[in-house]
């Protein structure tokens, strides 16, 4: 959500992950709640978002959240494995400097899923 402060704060973390792991198969996909295409385009430019962003109505996004474990926090992060199942999820911002263990857990799960040694 473009109005979400913690969402904005975690963009550099996801940009870093996208840069480090995209060529190995990771695809970061942001999903924004209640924004239109123009708002999202301006947001991604202003905040230098280096990964694709989707947008949708709160109703559509709530359905997605329900389908992916019933988590309704903004932000929420999900690591979806190659088989389409959720292998890791976290309700809240993932900020390396604030919570290094959560960031390390995510990196570990990414590397495990991508089979990186």
Predicted regions and their residues:
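Conserved redox-active cysteine motifs that mediate thiol-disulfide chemistry
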Residues: 1-16
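Short strand-loop junctions, especially beta-strand C-caps/beta-turns
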Residues: 2, 31, 92-93
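Extracytoplasmic/periplasmic, Sec-exported soluble proteins
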Residues: 6-9, 32-35, 72, 98, ...
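Conserved segment of the thioredoxin-like fold in thiol-based oxidoreductases
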Residues: 16-60
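Thiol/disulfide oxidoreductase modules built on the thioredoxin-like
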Residues: 46-49, 56-109
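Non-globular targeting/processing and membrane-anchoring segments
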Residues: 110-117
């Amino acid at each position: 959500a473009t109005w979400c402060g913690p969402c904005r704060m975690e963009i550099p973390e996801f940009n870093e992950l996208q840069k480090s792991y995209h060529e190995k198969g990771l695809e970061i996909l942001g999903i924004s709640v209640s924004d239109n295409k123009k708002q999202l385009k301006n947001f991604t430019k202003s905040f230098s978002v280096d990964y694709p962003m989707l947008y949708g109505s709160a109703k559509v996004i709530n359905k997605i959240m329900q389908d992916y474990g019933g988590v309704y926090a903004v932000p929420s992060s999900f690591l979806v494995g190659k088989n389409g199942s959720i292998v890791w999820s976290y309700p809240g911002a993932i900020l390396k400097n604030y919570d290094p263990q959560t960031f390390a857990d995510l990196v570990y799960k990414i590397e495990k899923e991508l089979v990186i040694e």
